UniProtKB/Swiss-Prot annotation:
Keyword Secreted among record annotations: no
Protein name: 32 kDa heat shock protein
GO molecular function: rDNA binding
Start and end residues of each stretch annotated as Disordered: 142-281
Any one Pfam family match given in the protein's UniProt record, by short name: NPL
InterPro entries per UniProt: NPL (IPR041232)
Induction: By heat shock.
Comp. bias (Acidic residues): 142-168
Species assigned in the record: Dictyostelium discoideum (Social amoeba)
GO terms of biological process kind: cellular response to heat
C-alpha cells in the first residue's frame, strides 16, 4: 500500500524519518517553500545510521536508554539556490532498517525553508498489501509473483506423479484390404497431354528479279557498243610537237646553208662583162 508523505525542513529544525517494520520511504522531490527567506546556496543532506540487529529485536527498550551509534554517514543529496534552483527531482528509497535525518547546511542558511515530498510503501508480513502494486522495491514482492505463477501453471510434484500413472490408450490403425496391383503398360492417347504445336511464322517474301526477254536482250546488246564509244578515250602519252621536233635539228643546217643561199641569190654576170674584163687584162 502506498501513501503520500510530505514534510518541511529548516536549518533550525531537521526532520527524523521514522518508519515501521516493513515500510519503505520513496523521496521524489525537494522544493524551496514560498515562505523561505534564505539567500545563497543551501545543501540538503541525509544523515543515515544503520540500525543494529539487537536494536531491531528489542522493540520494548525504553527511549531514555540510547546507545552510541558509530556507523553514521552524511550524504548531500541536492543543492538549492533561491532564484536559480528552486526545486530538484529525486529518486531515493529508505527502508525501516535505516535511521535517516534530513538537514540543511549552508553558511547563510538562516531563513531557508525546504519542502520534501514522496510516498511511503507499507508492508504486512513481509509481503505487499496492495494487489495492484507495481513497485520493484517492495519486499518479497517478486517471491509472491513466483508463487502465483507456480499455482497458475500447476507445477507441483503431485501433478507429475498423477500424469505418470495415467495410461495412454494405444491407437491401432484399421486393417486395409489387400488388392491386386495392375501395371499400366501404355497410356491411352486420349489421356496423353497434348503439347501445343508452335505456330509457324510466315517467312517474308523475297523479291523476284524478272529475267529480260529476248527482244530486250537484243536492245541491250545494241546499246553496249554505243556506250563503249561514248566512253572517253584513255589518256595517251603526250607526243612531242611536230614543229618543235622538226625545227630543233634543222636549225644548224639552215645556218650552214645560209652562205650557199647567198651565193645562189647573186645574179649571174653577163658574158659580155666577162669578156670586157679579159680584154682589159
Amino acid at each position: 500500500m502506498m501513501q503520500f508523505f510530505g514534510t518541511i525542513v529548516t536549518k533550525e529544525e531537521p526532520v527524523n524519518l521514522e518508519l515501521d517494520e516493513g515500510d519503505i520511504f520513496h523521496l521524489t522531490k525537494a522544493i524551496i517553500h514560498p515562505k523561505s527567506q534564505g539567500k545563497g546556496k543551501v545543501y540538503l543532506t541525509a544523515v543515515i545510521s544503520l540500525m543494529e540487529e539487537d536494536e531491531m529485536e528489542e522493540d520494548d527498550v525504553d527511549d531514555e536508554e540510547e546507545s552510541p551509534r558509530e556507523d553514521i554517514v552524511e550524504i548531500p543529496i541536492g543543492i538549492l539556490e533561491a532564484g536559480k534552483i528552486d526545486q530538484i527531482d529525486l529518486n531515493l528509497h529508505y527502508n525501516f532498517g535505516q535511521i535517516v535525518r534530513f538537514e540543511l547546511q549552508a553558511e547563510n542558511g538562516a531563513g531557508y525553508v525546504v519542502a520534501l515530498s514522496g510516498s511511503v510503501i507499507t508492508m504486512e508480513q513481509g509481503g505487499c498489501d496492495d494487489e495492484d502494486c507495481d513497485d520493484e522495491h517492495c519486499i518479497n514482492h517478486e517471491d509472491d509473483e513466483e508463487i502465483d505463477s507456480d499455482e497458475e501453471f500447476g507445477d507441483s510434484d503431485q501433478d507429475e506423479e498423477d500424469s505418470d500413472d495415467e495410461e495412454i490408450p494405444q491407437l491401432i490403425a484399421p486393417a486395409t484390404k489387400k488388392g491386386k496391383i495392375t501395371e499400366i503398360s501404355e497410356v491411352p492417347e486420349s489421356k496423353k497431354e497434348k503439347t501445343p504445336e508452335p505456330k509457324k511464322v510466315p517467312e517474308p517474301k523475297k523479291e523476284q528479279v524478272k529475267q529480260p526477254t529476248q527482244p530486250q536482250q537484243k536492245k541491250a546488246a545494241a546499246q553496249q557498243p554505243e556506250k563503249a564509244n561514248n566512253k572517253p578515250a584513255a589518256a595517251s602519252p603526250a607526243k612531242p610537237q611536230n614543229n618543235q621536233s622538226k625545227n630543233a635539228p634543222k636549225q644548224p643546217q639552215q645556218q650552214q646553208q645560209s652562205p650557199a643561199k647567198n651565193n645562189n641569190n647573186k645574179r649571174p654576170q653577163n658574158q659580155n662583162e666577162n669578156n670586157k674584163k679579159k680584154q682589159k687584162n
